[in-house]
Amino acid sequence: MEGQGVGRTLRLLRNRLPRLRAGQSQNNPGEAVTEPERIQEHSPSSFAGGQHFFEYLLVVSLKKKRLGDDYEPTITYQFPKRENLLRGQQEEEDRLLSAIPLFCFPDGNEWAPLTEYPRETFSFVLTNVDGSRKIGYCRRLLPAGPGPQLPKVYCIISCIGCFGLFSKILDEVEKRHQISMAVIYPFMQGLREAAFPAPGKTVTLKSFIPDSGTEFISLTRPLDSHLEHVDFSVLLHCLHLEQIIQIFASAVLERKIIFLAEGLSTLSQCIHAAAALLYPFSWAHTYIPVVPESLLATVCCPTPFMVGVQMRFLQEVMDSPMEEVLLVNLCEGTFLLSVGDEKDILPPKLQDDILDSLGQGINELKTSEQINEHVSGPFVQFFVKTVGHYASYIKREASGQGHFQERSFCKAVTSKTKRRFVKKFVKTQLFSLFIQEAEKSRNPPAGYFQKKILEYEEQKKQKKSRERL
C-alpha cells in the first residue's frame, strides 16, 4: 500500500504540474518541482526569459466546493490573458495554471472566514518540459472589507530569481489591492513594459493612485547578483551554525532532507537558503519549498529530496515510512530525525574552517546583502579548496569537447580526509551536472566561483614565495 501511495502522488505530480525536460533526473519519475534558483554560475540570466519582469499576475481565491464544507483554491484573476497560443503552448499553459493554486494554498482545503490573518510571503519553483524555470512569488492576505473573510493569494509568476525585488513589488500590489483591483492593473502593465535592470541598476515606474496622486516607484537590483535570489537571515535565526553545516553536509551527499515550520515564509526562505549553500552546484532532485497536503507522500520517496512541510502535518510525516532522512524542526531548532553521521561527512579541518569563518563578526552584520555574503562565502571556499582544481583535469579534443579525468583529479588531492570526501562527491549528480557543463565549455565561466578559485590560487603562490624567502 505504501508504494501505491507514493505512486499516486507521483501520478498527481505528472498530471498537475508542468512536465520535466527529457533526460533530467531519471531516478525521479514524475518529479516536477526541482532545482533551486541558483542553478548555474550565471544564475539570474538563466531565468531571464526576455525583457519582462514577470509572465503572470494571478489572484488565487478559495471557493466552496459544491459538496461538503471544504474550499478549493481557484484562479479568479489573471493578467495578462494569453490569446492565439499554439496547441502545445496552450497545453503547457493549462498545466502551469492548474498547478499554481495547489502551491498557493498548500495547507489543505479546510478553511473558514477569518477576521485576522497575518500576511505571508513565500515562493515556489516549477520546471517546464524545456528546462526553463518559473518562480511563483506569493503574498497571502485577507481582502479588505467588513466582516470575516477568506484569505487570497497574489502570485507573480516570473522566470527571474530576485526575491528582494519581487517582495517590494508584492508590497506595491498589496497597497493597491486595498483600494481596488482596477488600480493594480496599470501598475503591473507598467512593470511588464519595463526592462529588467542590470545588477546595481534601478528601474523607476510612474504609477497613479487615487487620493494619493502620481507616485514614482524605484526597483533596484543588488550589485552582487549571485545572491539576489536568497536571504540567509531566517535560516540563521532558526538554527545554530553547527546545524547549518550538518544540513549542508547532508545536501552535498544528496540525502533526503525535510524542513518543518509553522509559517510558509519561514519554510520557503529556509529551504531556498539551504539549497543556495551548494553554489556553484545545483540540487538536481525533488525540490519543493512547501509541500501541498495532497503531496505529503513525497516524503516516502526512495530518491533524494529537499522539501518543506508545515508543522501541522508533523504527525503524518512521522507516521510515514522513511529511511535515512534528516528531519529539521525550524520552530525548535532541532533535528527530529537524522542518519547520525552528519558531523563526520566533511573533512574535519575544512568543517572547522567553515564554522570559524561563519562565527567571526556575524553579530556586526546589518544588511541582508552583508549577511548573504558572510554566510555564502565559507561554503564557496569549501568547494574551492576541495574541487577548485577541476578545470586542470579536463582534457580537450581538437573539437573542443572536454573529458574529465576523474581518477587523476582525485589523486591530486593530497590530504587523505579531503580525498575521501572528494571521492564520494564526484559520484553525486551535483558534481556530474557541473562537470558536464564544464566539459562543453572551452574556458571556465568567468563568474563568482571562478573568481574565488583564482584568488585562492594567487594566495597559494604568494604563500610559497614567502616560504622561499
Swiss-Prot record:
Show where the uDENN domain sits: 55-204
Is Cytoplasm among this UniProt entry's keywords? yes
List, alphabetically, the InterPro entries matched: cDENN_dom, dDENN_dom, DENN_C, DENN_domain_containing_2, Tripartite_DENN, uDENN_dom
Checking PROSITE patterns in the record gives: DENN
Q: Cellular component GO terms, alphabetically? A: cytosol; nucleoplasm
The UniProt GO MF terms for this protein read:
guanyl-nucleotide exchange factor activity
All copies of domain cDENN, residue ranges: 226-359
Q: Where is this region: Disordered?
A: 17-44
Coiled coil residues, start to end: none
- Give the keywords, sorted: Cytoplasm, Guanine-nucleotide releasing factor
- What is the protein's major site of localization? cytoplasm
dDENN domain mapped to chain residues: 361-445
Q: Which cellular compartments is it found in? A: Cytoplasm
Query: Which Pfam families does the UniProt entry name for this protein?
Result: dDENN (PF03455), DENN (PF02141), uDENN (PF03456)
Does Kinase show up as a keyword for this record? no
- Task of the protein: Guanine nucleotide exchange factor (GEF) which may activate RAB9A and RAB9B. Promotes the exchange of GDP to GTP, converting inactive GDP-bound Rab proteins into their active GTP-bound form.
Q: What is this protein called?
A: DENN domain-containing protein 2D
